[in-house]
Amino acid sequence: MLELDLQLATEAPAPSEAQFREWCALALRQRTADSELTIRLVDEPEGRELNHTWRQKDYATNVLSFPADVPDELLDIPLLGDLVICVEVVEREAKEQGKELEAHWAHLVIHGCLHLLGYDHIDDDEAEEMETLEQTLLAELGHPDPYADDDAQKHSTVTIKDSE
């Protein structure tokens, strides 16, 4: 079971909750345990503020992932963490990169969920493993390879790990 808390902190149009559930469930299907996660959809000012606070970057990025650092045994449902998605950045990127908006949304949600599961793209081997899984999952949805034309977008999602 997936418990999804979808928070809308922007009035910009976004995919339906059913779409978010489908994309998350696909990315998390390798996980046998129940899972809880939050997706917060934000505008550019909030996206910029969070990116500045956590990464010292003064711009809004498309997706930030915040993996939970709470032992599963302390929770009724294992908390995976939070994704923060800047709607305006997602829309702009899709347009600039000539990508179908729904496909770009699906990619970024899947990419963020994989970060919450511990996948990363710090080195080439990790990146290849993560990207291959993303490509496979997106193909199941009928979406094209998101990395086919634009290597610069390969590693757009940032994982924030609490250093405390």
From Swiss-Prot:
GO terms for cellular component: cytoplasm. Residues 155-164 have a biased composition (Polar residues). Zn(2+) binds at H111, H115, H121. SUPFAM superfamilies: Metalloproteases ('zincins'), catalytic domain. InterPro entries: MetalPrtase_cat_dom_sf_prd, YbeY, YbeY_CS. Its EC number is 3.1.-.-. Its cofactor is Zn(2+). The gene is ybeY. Single strand-specific metallo-endoribonuclease involved in late-stage 70S ribosome quality control and in maturation of the 3' terminus of the 16S rRNA. The keyword Zinc applies. Residues 140-164 are annotated as: Disordered. It comes from Pseudomonas fluorescens (strain SBW25). This is Endoribonuclease YbeY. GO terms for biological process: rRNA processing. Keywords: Cytoplasm, Endonuclease, Hydrolase, Metal-binding, Nuclease, Ribosome biogenesis, rRNA processing, Zinc. It is found in: Cytoplasm. One of its GO terms (molecular function) is zinc ion binding. Binds 1 zinc ion.
